[in-house]
Amino acid sequence: MAIMAMCMPILPGKKDMWKGMIDEVKKDPNFAASREAAGVHERTFLQETPHGDFIILTYEGENPEAGFAQIMANMPPEFAAFAKEVHGLDVNAGPPPMPTLAFDSRA
């Protein structure tokens, strides 16, 4: 099983909006099902820092990069608008650069 992790900013003043979305996502079985359909187990962490807030996303599965690409391609328009407003992520601009594994204590 492979894993991929990435970090995205929560733009200034948008943390409460993000928290509200997370509350909705937790109640929506279709959201989790979309991740299963993409072949990944997604986890989302909130990282609060003195320099701003971030989310850390992990995708675990046979091919997390392909799963992430599928999630991006099938993102509902309202969620795409949310990602743009809260994270500055334009899902129509193509995928962001994929993260590079810098250290693995078991490798």
What is the meaning of each model-derived region?
Residues N30-H41, E60-P97:
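An amphipathic, aromatic/His-enriched active-site/gating alpha helix that lines ligand/cofactor pockets
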